[in-house]
Amino acid sequence: GEIEMLRSVIVFLVHIFSVIVFRVKLVGKENVPKEGAYIMCANHQSNWDAPILVSSTKRKMHVMAKEELFKNKFIYWLGDKCLVFPVKRGKMDLDSMKHSLKVLKDGEILMLFPEGTRKGMAKNGRAQNGAAFMALRTGVPVIPVNISGEMKPFHKVTIYYGKPLDFSEYKTSKPEKEVLEKVSKEIMDNIIMLEK
């Protein structure tokens, strides 16, 4: 429909912009599944991270973003067209949790930033457990992604895609805190290792 077409145009324009302005280079793209559900987890440096990752992925991707962004009317409009949905930070958000589980059950892609805040890794921020929870509830693979380089015009940005992480052995409807934290740490460790 019209929204799909508008979304495709927006994604295409962002892709052109990212290649020219941020000189984006993709490494390890062969690690990204061509079909089936998965969770993409990346480090978070700037508000350009999500648009650039979406435009670098051929498939439809649903993006979890902090609720505060949606106060901007343009971002709200854009997000609505580009499958971005809000999450309340620092507390259990059942609506975003249900939406995320539905996305994965429908065989689509969910993207989120496990640190929860920008520059989280630089400050050694502890990973939030949302990605681990989704992976353990659904058994879908997690693709770790590292965005390296500054998101400033004409600075080179490299996106490293890691091999899928399989946590299906821990799949359960009620993940325990210890397992959630173990899986969250493994996801973050894999994101960090990609830059080395």
Regions found by a protein language model. Give the residues of each.
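Conserved protein kinase catalytic domain
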Residues: 14, 18, 41, 54, ...
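Non-catalytic C-terminal accessory region of glycerolipid acyltransferases
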Residues: 1, 5-6, 95-196
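Catalytic core of membrane glycerolipid acyltransferases/transacylases, capturing the structured
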Residues: 6, 10-12, 19, 27, ...
